[in-house]
């Protein structure tokens, strides 16, 4: 039914333009003002449909951006982690402090926690020199930090997009109900009032 918004608009405009039936329409409770109100309901639905379409597009884009940011952080972290571990393979305490002990995490929350721990401790004097010699420079750590922040922002945008979709869907559905309730009543009146004038009903698409 929602997809019939355009057809509803065509019907209402055809009725508004039909001067031959104007007097009977007004007498039946459908003066120009009421028909204009009906057209306003149709325009409100069109606006709500556009909002829903935009929300769908925003959510799709947000999901795509999140996947890209997720992959970028995983790839960068895996490289930095491997280089960092190679500097402290015989120092379990250092590995623990830097968040490098055990297997590489796969869960994103664990990865983000491990990245945060590495970024906090890598600049400390006990670790910075060795890490730099293995290629884990300040610039490389800054790059990792940027990837982490990009993922956090992508997550925020994704959640915002997800929460927006139900709201605009409810708005669309409410607008559709108001319009089509109005249209059902109008069509019932029109069929009764103009049952002897099928040509008029045909002009209106009823």
Segments the model singles out, each with a brief description of its role:
Residues 1-206:
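Basic/polar low-complexity intrinsically disordered segments
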């Amino acid at each position: 039914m929602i997809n019939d918004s355009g057809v509803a608009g065509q019907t209402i405009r055809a009725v508004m333009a039909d001067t031959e039936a104007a007097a009977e329409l007004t007498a039946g409770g459908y003066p120009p003002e009421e028909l204009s109100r009906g057209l306003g309901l149709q325009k409100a639905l069109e606006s709500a449909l556009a909002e829903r379409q935009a929300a769908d597009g925003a959510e799709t884009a947000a999901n795509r951006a999140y996947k890209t940011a997720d992959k970028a952080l995983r790839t960068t972290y895996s490289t930095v982690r491997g280089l960092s571990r190679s500097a402290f393979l015989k120092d379990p305490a250092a590995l623990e402090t830097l968040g490098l002990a055990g297997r590489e995490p796969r869960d994103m929350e664990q990865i983000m926690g491990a990245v945060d721990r590495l970024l906090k401790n890598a600049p400390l004097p006990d670790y910075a020199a060795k890490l730099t010699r293995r290629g884990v420079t300040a610039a490389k750590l800054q790059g990792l930090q940027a990837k982490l922040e990009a993922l956090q922002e992508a997550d925020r945008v994704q959640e915002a997009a997800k929460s927006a979709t139900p709201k605009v869907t409810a708005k669309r559905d409410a607008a559709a109900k108001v319009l089509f309730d109005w249209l059902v009543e109008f069509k019932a009146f029109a069929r009764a009032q103009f049952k002897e004038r099928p040509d008029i009903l045909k002009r209106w698409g009823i």
